[in-house]
From Swiss-Prot:
It comes from Influenza A virus (strain A/Goose/Guangxi/345/2005 H5N1 genotype G). It comes from the Viruses. A motif (Nuclear export signal) lies at residues 8-17, 81-90. GO terms for biological process: exit of virus from host cell nucleus through nuclear pore. Belongs to the influenza viruses NEP family. It holds the Pfam family Flu_NS2. This is Nuclear export protein. It is found in: Virion; Host nucleus.
């Protein structure tokens, strides 16, 4: 998924969209943020039993996890909306792949968080 993230982010950054580039840049920033968060959850799971370390680093990790799930749901809805309104096939493919990747990341985050609980 790392190469998928990089590929989609690169393609999204090159799109000339009819809507605000600030919106697109915000989406790209959120994508990157979610990727980093998913990676940190994965690292905690790899060090299995690292819940104590996660809690020590971030006492409000459950609240942060909840916020990240809200953020990913918002991104999924935003990408779905963009997919519906765009007529450009390149953009449609990019947003479709972004949607698939977001759904995969959401599932990975759920799996990691259940393993930590």
């Amino acid at each position: 998924t790392v190469s998928s993230f990089q590929d989609i982010l690169m393609r999204m950054s090159k799109m000339q969209l009819g809507y605000s580039s600030e919106d697109l840049n915000g989406m790209i920033t959120r994508f990157e943020s979610l990727k980093l968060y998913r990676d940190s959850l994965g690292e905690a799971v790899i060090r299995m039993g690292d819940l104590h370390s996660l809690q020590t680093r971030n006492g409000k990790w459950r609240e942060q996890l909840s916020h990240k799930f809200e953020e990913i749901r918002w991104l999924i809805e935003e990408v779905r909306h963009r997919l519906k309104i765009t007529e450009n096939s390149f953009e449609q493919i990019t947003f479709m792949q972004a949607l698939q990747l977001l759904l995969e990341v959401e599932q990975e985050m759920r799996t990691f968080s259940f393993q930590l609980i």
